[in-house]
């Protein structure tokens, strides 16, 4: 992993982990260690792939579509990891993941 990729991963973790972990705790799906582990785990899976493919993007729409795929993958993984069962909870989790990814993407575009 390049130094730039590590900086981008650190930024992503710094923004998304507190948001998603806090949400999981407030929803009472998991305790603090599980909330942090899940939030870190999904980002360690998705971020390197997104970072690698995004270097070749020529359009902002490519980034938007790639982020949509990341949100879907992270939501599915967190639903499984945290044993989220209710459909409404799954939708709510997806919205939290959208918010976290939007925040980290916006910050990344501003500072990197």
Model-derived features: where do they sit?
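Juxtamembrane/disordered regions of integral membrane proteins
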Residues: 1-112
